[in-house]
């Protein structure tokens, strides 16, 4: 139609490829073609494409038919990526252009640079042929150093004015999520005790930093030992920097209950901490509390996923692993709160 709106309302979550190409072309100021779906992210539609100069790019589009809010707010992601280009030694894709659309029917989108490489999460991926162990371990060290570099700059210094989420608010968020899920009696008891201990021992906050929300090797494009770009910023926020560090350590923990390759070569959690502290130049206080919080958080996120899978009659082997992991994560959180 002349005003750029689709002639018919789109199906929810289904984008019109010709519309995406047209608006991506307008956003970057040169023709974009060869649009193809690209795995990555869970909250938006992601495509690979090529400019007329043969340069590969990525187009992220909010789901059509839904308000572009929270983790569907792709323009918010673009603003964060643009701000983070000012942080030395933090590799993120470059934003090449945006289009605000007319949501919800014409969804917002942005175009960013394409980062070559692989996203490999050592202890949560089953591969017949793994990358060389030395390369994977160096990727872990690079991820810890890059996280320390990110934390050298406060969110306010980057021009990000969003309100910081406090550790207490994090506890309350995941407590509310768990309250909607049916837990076995032992798990329910562990949840109650864990929540009480987390609330009773709230740590003194640090300067708010930009948080990725899922900082791990599986969200990084790597070539050899080098991290080319940290991707999938849908759930970024501003909060206590120890959250992302604790999450990185959790994903490297060989005792993680849903780890499918616990013996895969990777930096151990304490090695990641040592690299981070060396890079930041100071010890990390009260990290045990955050180690407990991220396990409580993942127990809540897993319980929600299990609940929804059961409701949709889509229980898979992966879902069963998560169901089994919920009480184990809560028990592991309690262990870290009682040391």
Question: What does each of the following model-derived ranges do?
Answer:
Residues 2-30:
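Juxta-kinase regulatory segment immediately upstream of eukaryotic protein kinase catalytic domains
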Residues 19-20, 76, 80, 142-146, ...:
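Charged catalytic carboxylate motif
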Residues 24-32, 87-91, 280:
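Short secondary-structure junctions
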Residues 36-170, 176-194, 203-205:
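ATP-binding pocket architecture of kinase catalytic cores
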Residues 36-50, 58-59, 95, 150, ...:
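Active-site acidic catalytic loop and adjacent metal/ATP-binding pocket
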Residues 162-165, 282-294:
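All-alpha amphipathic helical-bundle segments outside canonical DNA-binding/catalytic cores
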Residues 243-281, 294-312:
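Active-site activation/catalytic loop segments of kinase-like enzymes and analogous catalytic loops
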Residues 282, 300-339:
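Helical subdomain adjoining the active site within ATP-dependent kinase catalytic cores
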